[in-house]
């Protein structure tokens, strides 16, 4: 695994290995012959999805798991593909837990891009005025 050079994408100066590259490596690497990736959705409705990806060896021993949560209303991709996005993220995390395609971070490129976008577009929250001390605070000297 150490000798393999993964294709990466640059996001804000950091290199990230996309899930498709991790999956291609996992499927092509002879040491993972007869291993499985299985996914399940403990939560799946019209608004959100939670996916669990499990990687098992040929004896069906669980080697790694990964979880993801996506909300249908979040972002352009999720409006039509939140289930697929959720499953891909969970699989990427499970492969990352095995050390496949991990250098600096286990977040997928999409997760990093989404996080940056959300941070940049968060509404500004006004600071609340300091609350007046209530009678109990005054009684104990706060």
What are these regions (language model features)?
Residues 1-142:
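Polyanion-binding surfaces on beta-sheet-dominated domains and ring/shell assemblies
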């Amino acid at each position: 695994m150490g000798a393999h050079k993964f294709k990466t994408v640059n996001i804000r100066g950091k290199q990230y290995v996309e899930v498709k590259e991790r999956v291609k490596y996992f499927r092509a690497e002879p040491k993972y012959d007869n291993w499985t990736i299985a996914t399940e959705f403990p939560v799946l409705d019209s608004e959100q999805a939670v996916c669990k990806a499990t990687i098992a060896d040929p004896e069906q021993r669980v080697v790694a798991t990964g979880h993801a949560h996506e909300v249908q209303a979040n972002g352009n991709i999720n409006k039509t593909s939140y289930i697929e996005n959720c499953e891909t993220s969970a699989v990427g995390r499970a492969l990352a837990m095995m050390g496949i395609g991990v250098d600096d971070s286990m977040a997928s490129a999409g997760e990093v891009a989404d996080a940056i976008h959300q941070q940049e577009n968060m509404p500004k929250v006004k600071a609340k005025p300091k609350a007046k001390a209530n009678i109990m605070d005054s009684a104990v000297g706060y």
